[in-house]
Amino acid sequence: MAAYVIADVEVVDSAKFREYGAQVPATVEEYGGKYLVRGGAVEKAEGNWEPNRMVVIEFKSMDQLKKWYHSQEYDGPMQLRHQSANSNVLFVEGV
């Protein structure tokens, strides 16, 4: 079953976040992931959520998603994200 990373990202250091953005796609691809949403316009339909920059990444399974997220390849970029943005990240199983 497919699994998705859903992230709401508030960038606080643009230069470092650009560095993160340049590094992470290769790690996603290495683990079979595919970006479905990467930034772009966000329109809230209802609720109290005030989203920022939205990202959705699809993996073939939750196991593969977690292998990527906890990998050595993603560790460096993840540290850059922690330094350059405030993030809310979910892992969701889908169809």
At which residue positions do the language-model features occur?
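C-terminal structural segments of small proteins and small subunits
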Residues: 62-90
